[in-house]
Amino acid sequence: MKSSHIALLCIVVLSLFALHECCEQGGQRHSQKVNEACVPGPCHPLVPHCWCCEHLRGIRPQCCWSGSTGRDYCNQQCNL
């Protein structure tokens, strides 16, 4: 490989790493504190990984959500 190819490859790898870090954080910086109203917990024996409203935990078990967007949806609903 020529040195220009190596330099170009390094730039691409660094760009992909930066993009991965940005997507993993949801576009938010570490310094910003996110107000989360939900906590992880089991909502049913068949669905072990759910997000439940912390202030309604044990009172209303139906206030839990699962799935890939469960955390975001839970935070939206619990902050109402």
UniProtKB/Swiss-Prot annotation:
Residues 1-22 form the signal peptide. Transmembrane segments: none annotated. Expressed in leaves. It comes from the Eukaryota. Keywords: Disulfide bond, Signal. Disulfide bonds join C38-C52, C43-C78, C50-C74, C53-C64. Belongs to the MEG family. This is EMBRYO SURROUNDING FACTOR 1-like protein 1. It comes from Arabidopsis thaliana (Mouse-ear cress). The gene is ESFL1.
